[in-house]
UniProtKB/Swiss-Prot annotation:
Similarity section: Belongs to the ATPase C chain family.
Membrane topology: Multi-pass membrane protein
Protein name in the entry: ATP synthase subunit 9, mitochondrial
Entry's localization field: Mitochondrion membrane
Keywords: CF(0), Hydrogen ion transport, Ion transport, Lipid-binding, Membrane, Mitochondrion, Transmembrane, Transmembrane helix, Transport
Organism from which the protein derives: Candida glabrata (strain ATCC 2001 / BCRC 20586 / JCM 3761 / NBRC 0622 / NRRL Y-65 / CBS 138) (Yeast)
PANTHER family with a match to the protein in the record: ATP SYNTHASE LIPID-BINDING PROTEIN, MITOCHONDRIAL, ATPASE PROTEIN 9
GO molecular function: ATP hydrolysis activity; identical protein binding; lipid binding; proton-transporting ATP synthase activity, rotational mechanism
Transmembrane segments: 14-34, 56-76
A single cellular component GO annotation: mitochondrial inner membrane
Site (Reversibly protonated during proton transport): 59
Subunit-level organization: F-type ATPases have 2 components, CF(1) - the catalytic core - and CF(0) - the membrane proton channel. CF(1) has five subunits: alpha(3), beta(3), gamma(1), delta(1), epsilon(1). CF(0) has three main subunits: a, b and c.
SUPFAM superfamilies xrefs: F1F0 ATP synthase subunit C
InterPro entries the UniProt entry points to: ATP_synth_F0_csu, ATP_synth_F0_csu_DDCD_BS, ATP_synth_F0_csu_sf, ATPase_proteolipid_c-like_dom, F/V-ATP_Csub_sf
Amino acid sequence: MQLALAAKYIGAGISTIGLIGAGIGIGIVFAALINGVSRNPSLKDTLFSYSILGMALSEATGLFCLMISFMLLFAV
């Protein structure tokens, strides 16, 4: 019983590694936004809307990883 509980906690911890990728992805998206606005300030509104879309897609991946982690902890 203790081995199954330990495996559940280890699996939940490993499944949160995807959150690191989401954080890096969001950082890259907004770094590209800053770079694009500094090169062409007239496209600020367009670039901002694209960066929000990119941030949402990157954050969705992280939320899926977090959901799997919670499912491993509380549903299995």
